[in-house]
Amino acid sequence: MLENLCTLPLSADLFTQVLHPSEPLLTVGLASGKVETFRLPNDDDEEDESGRRTSTSSGRGMIKSIWSTRRHKGSCRHLAYSHDGSAMYSAGTDSVVKHFSPETGNVISKIGLPPRNSATSTTDCPAILHVLSPQTLLLGTDSGGLYIFDLRENGSLNPKPVRKHVPHADYISSITPLPASAESTSGFPKQWVSTGGTTLAVTDLRHGIVATSEDQEDELLCSTIIPTGLGPKKMRSNAVVAVGTGNGILTLWDRGAWDDQQERINVAGGRTKKDGESLDAIVRVPDELGWGKKVIVGVGDGSLSIVDLKRREVQFVLKHDEVEGVSALTFDYQNRLISGGGRTVKVWAESGDDDLDEEEEEEAEATGFKRPARSDSDSDDDSEDERPQKSSNKKQKKGKGNQARSVAFPGLD
């Protein structure tokens, strides 16, 4: 179903990765505070220097470092692109949010987070960023706070947040926008689902927190939305949100019924809660691949589980790493899967063998490839040397900057 095209080594543990919406650009944020952008092989790059055609149409070629810098004094916790890809934002443990150019990495503007509350001068630590629309950026924090910032015409952040809500009692682990209603004139979301600690919440841009779930008695770590096709009977067009938990269970939530989960899929659970592996990252498989209603889940044991949401089962298991868990999953605009965790990023593409016959399925099960479901100082000097640091990111309990480097894909002459 998927084959690994390339493994990209990193200089420190990965905290976050993000892909340009329309260009083959991958940016990573590391525990050392370093941010680096790579150019992935592109279908348009059809000839090499000697004029020979390369195999980039299948996603093979060279990954090249475009720029690198120490963006934050502490770790880089999260990255986000603007909707059109013209601007990027980073947030670090230094409680600073920076707006910079994706092509050069040059900082255009920056802001510091306000104090956590009126009773203290201590600033909160950012945990996650999400650009909701061309005018709005959301920032979730370690304390469960959620700030709403206005974006100016050039993408710069207004220094003061427009609003602050506190939907969770613990750090915000994911933000998933809900599709705009049919009556929307802009087409951009006005509501979003967030997870933090052991609860799920829904927040409205204008009206604040509109729903909070019951205590799930398990950490909710990641989420994604399936817009149609999985809702209850006679409501198949209703959206469903898939949420990964700390004990290896993938839970499904019907839009509008936010008090509790409706379905459970055992992805990496054990006999007890302590035995399960955490589900730290999730991504919906693009419709263009024609796989049906599936998600790929990054697991704390370093595996990638491909989950069929209609059958409520794990169909295939791949391996990102033997030791480190998978902390980030994204599909690029060419529908290649990018998995990240530990000190490696991997690029995956369809192998061409989408349909296994019965004999192949038996062989896959015998080798363990297929697993059935179970029951239940602001330094932007590109020449600065980097030294990996220990991470303070709660989700990870479990050379020189400007020199270009590249990694070859296999299969080239």
Curated annotation (Swiss-Prot):
SUPFAM superfamilies: WD40 repeat-like (SSF50978)
Main location: nucleus
Cellular localisation: Nucleus, Nucleolus
Acidic residues compositional bias, start-end: 353-365
WD repeats: 30-70, 71-110, 120-159, 220-263, 277-317, 321-358
Keyword Repeat in record: yes
This protein's GO CC annotations: nucleolus
Region Disordered, residue ranges: 39-61, 353-413
Nucleus found in the keyword field: yes
UniProt entry keywords in alphabetical sequence: Nucleus, Repeat, WD repeat
Family per record: Belongs to the WD repeat WDR55 family.
Name the UniProt record assigns to this protein: WD repeat-containing protein JIP5
Species: Podospora anserina (strain S / ATCC MYA-4624 / DSM 980 / FGSC 10383)
